């Protein structure tokens, strides 16, 4: 059914953008501060 092809692509685009925003929020709120804290603590320990 060729009538449904644009809706399929819009659906895919919507869920793709939603997934990207959720991943971006998760990384910026949780994972990146943990990695940064680990890096800073390693730097601090190596300076001692």
Curated annotation (Swiss-Prot):
It holds the Pfam family Fun_ATP-synt_8. GO terms for molecular function: proton-transporting ATP synthase activity, rotational mechanism. It is a single-pass membrane protein. InterPro entries: ATP_synth_su8_fun (IPR009230). The chain crosses the membrane at residues 12-32. Keywords: ATP synthesis, CF(0), Hydrogen ion transport, Ion transport, Membrane, Mitochondrion, Transmembrane, Transmembrane helix, Transport. It is found in: Mitochondrion membrane. It comes from the Eukaryota. Signal peptide: none annotated. One of its GO terms (cellular component) is proton-transporting ATP synthase complex. GO terms for biological process: proton motive force-driven ATP synthesis. Mitochondrial membrane ATP synthase (F(1)F(0) ATP synthase or Complex V) produces ATP from ADP in the presence of a proton gradient across the membrane which is generated by electron transport complexes of the respiratory chain. F-type ATPases consist of two structural domains, F(1) - containing the extramembraneous catalytic core and F(0) - containing the membrane proton channel, linked together by a central stalk and a peripheral stalk. During catalysis, ATP synthesis in the catalytic domain of F(1) is coupled via a rotary mechanism of the central stalk subunits to proton translocation. F-type ATPases have 2 components, CF(1) - the catalytic core - and CF(0) - the membrane proton channel. Belongs to the ATPase protein 8 family. This is ATP synthase protein 8. It comes from Candida glabrata (strain ATCC 2001 / BCRC 20586 / JCM 3761 / NBRC 0622 / NRRL Y-65 / CBS 138).
